[in-house]
Amino acid sequence: MKTRVAVMFGGKSVEHEVSVISGIQAIMSMDQEKYEVIPVYLTKKNEMYVGEEIGKIEAYKDIPGLLSKSQRVILVNEDDHIVLMPYPVRLFGKKSIEVDIAFPIVHGTNVEDGALQGYLKTIGIPFVGCDVTSSALGMDKYASKVVLKENGVPVLDGYCFTTSDYAEIDSILDKVEKEIGYPAIVKPVDLGSSVGISVARNRS
């Protein structure tokens, strides 16, 4: 009997489109002899959809059209049976799809940072990949740096500044110039990959 895998991709993230590509590439690479793959698309509102076209990359050229011919679902645990249930629930609606495990192929905040993993864990759904804590740590660049450094892994020096700290921007720049120097890499603490990264070569 094949393992039924709900491959989840997309989601409420600035890396939404990259996640769609990653998810479909993962689906295409999975052994169809071992796995019954159920593609699950998460919209930019984190709504879940399944359907015949969900696993086809060309369908994402027209997302409203794709959703109109797909079925919105919710992922639930019914007496230890994991199902993708059509939403809204109707007495004589479409049947639920039973799955064995979820496989999140997601990038960025709101999905890769432990949020989706926490949701899956809360409702008791087995999933592939990092747990909540490691997902959250991996997404927070400064927290990752601190944990690595505390465990003897060589890392470059860095500082984390919040939005409120920018009221003292001159003090921040003084600290950067004194303790790090230029060029300095400036990046959001919790966006994925290289999103938002820039290089500061001087004070201005």
Question: What are these regions, as identified by a protein language model?
Answer:
Residues 147-155:
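Basic phosphate/pyrophosphate-binding loop/patch that engages nucleotide-derived ligands
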Residues 106-109, 159, 189, 203:
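Anionic group-transfer/hydrolysis microenvironments
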Residues 97, 153, 180:
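Structured loop/turn residues at beta-strand edges in well-structured enzyme cores
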Residues 198-204:
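Conserved ATP-binding module of the ATP-grasp superfamily
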Residues 148-149, 176-197:
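ATP-grasp fold ATP-binding core
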Residues 1-133, 137-139, 143, 150, ...:
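ATP-binding N-terminal substructure of ATP-dependent carboxylate-amine bond-forming enzymes
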